[in-house]
């Protein structure tokens, strides 16, 4: 039964205590509002339709992300990248909204603004996917009641046109020269990236003890599975020429430094629209041009599916024409 009483400041406070349900209370400007609220809540309880939304209404998106990062992100391979996305969400105007308050219209506003700013569709999709998983965890694992996933009602950005950028021999030569003037390790990093089609993170976490004869054994991969990458004669020569480090790592540079140095080298070499990840695309395409099968290429590059490989295998038209005769 609800108890309604007027407070000293003139507002009305309604309290509901019912066996089997949490105690609830709320303040209102008028007695009629308090009575209406009490009747609705008690009616839902009687019909077994009551949902306790207090946690959903009192927990902000930023607070939820703080818990998510502690309990979920920490176990992920990409925790560092996810931390940056979480930080951006938490600091935004959406971070101060409660989980119950954030609507699909808010996320549509975010989507359109980010695309207008020039963010890629994939970048926006990743940010929205993070919000979606936050709500999935909050509903399923944390048991926060009264929530629905706002991303499920949202139109996601269309996939960006997949990059098909391959450097010419002249461009690669110019970038290698410029990179050598920036940092001594950069030319080897660039060449080995092309020769092996390794991801940036895989290459930079490579340890000397994992370079074994004609193979490099990758203990830390994006997919979390151990992988052996065959080394070409050129790749092996480049690795052998690098000085041994006391810490056992093959390279000293951090991933973000390599990306920055690569962009600077491209700028100095007057090479436009070339990203470090394009080197993996180039290396993968070269493997196909050498006649390797999809399964063979996948075992080298670590791509899990044929559809993922298609993203990288834009074979040179001249080579295809040669095969046709």
Give residue spans per PLM region:
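Active-site/catalytic core of tyrosine-dependent DNA strand-transfer enzymes
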Residues: 232-272
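DNA breakage-rejoining catalytic core of tyrosine-based enzymes
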Residues: 24, 100, 144-147, 158-177, ...
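Basic, Lys/Arg- and aromatic-enriched nucleic-acid-binding interface segment
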Residues: 121, 125, 140, 144-200, ...
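Catalytic-site neighborhood detector that most strongly recognizes the C-terminal catalytic loop/helix
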Residues: 166, 220-224, 234-236, 256, ...
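Short, Arg/Lys-rich segments that mark the N-terminal edge of DNA/RNA- and chromatin-recognition modules
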Residues: 1-29
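Basic/aromatic-enriched alpha-helical hairpins
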Residues: 43-46, 62-119, 134-141
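C-terminal catalytic core of tyrosine-transesterase DNA break-rejoin enzymes
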Residues: 140, 188-191, 195-202, 264, ...
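Conserved tyrosine-mediated DNA breakage-rejoining catalytic core shared by Y-recombinases
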Residues: 152-156, 165, 169-174, 196-241
């Amino acid at each position: 039964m609800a108890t309604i009483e007027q407070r000293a400041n003139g507002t009305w406070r309604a309290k509901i205590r019912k066996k089997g349900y949490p105690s609830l209370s709320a303040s209102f400007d008028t007695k009629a509002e308090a009575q209406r609220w009490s009747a609705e809540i008690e009616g839902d309880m009687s019909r077994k339709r009551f949902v306790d939304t207090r946690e959903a209404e009192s927990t902000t998106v930023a607070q939820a992300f703080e818990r998510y990062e502690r309990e979920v992100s920490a176990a992920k391979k990409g925790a560092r990248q996810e931390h940056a996305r979480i930080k951006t969400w938490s600091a935004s105007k959406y971070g101060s909204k409660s989980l119950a308050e954030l609507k699909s219209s808010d996320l549509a506003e975010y989507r359109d603004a980010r695309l207008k700013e020039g963010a890629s569709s994939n970048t926006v999709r990743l940010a929205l996917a993070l919000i979606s998983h936050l709500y999935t965890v909050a509903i399923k694992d944390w048991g926060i009641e009264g929530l629905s996933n706002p991303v499920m009602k949202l139109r996601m950005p269309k996939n960006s046109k997949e990059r098909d950028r391959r450097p010419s021999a002249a461009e690669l030569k110019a970038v290698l020269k410029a990179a050598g003037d920036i940092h001594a390790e950069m030319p080897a990093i660039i060449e080995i990236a092309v020769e092996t089609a390794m991801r940036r993170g895989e290459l930079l976490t490579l340890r000397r003890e994992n370079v074994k004869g004609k193979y490099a054994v990758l203990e830390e991969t994006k997919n979390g599975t151990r992988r052996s990458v065959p080394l070409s004669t050129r790749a092996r020569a480049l690795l052998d020429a690098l000085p041994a480090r006391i810490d056992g790592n093959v390279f000293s540079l951090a991933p973000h430094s390599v990306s920055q140095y690569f962009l600077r080298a491209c700028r100095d070499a007057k090479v436009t629209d070339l990203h470090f990840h394009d080197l993996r695309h180039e290396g993968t395409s070269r493997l196909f041009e050498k006649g390797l099968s999809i399964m063979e290429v996948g075992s080298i590059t670590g791509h899990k599916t044929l559809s993922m490989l298609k993203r990288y295998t834009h074979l040179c038209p001249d080579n295809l024409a040669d095969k046709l005769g």
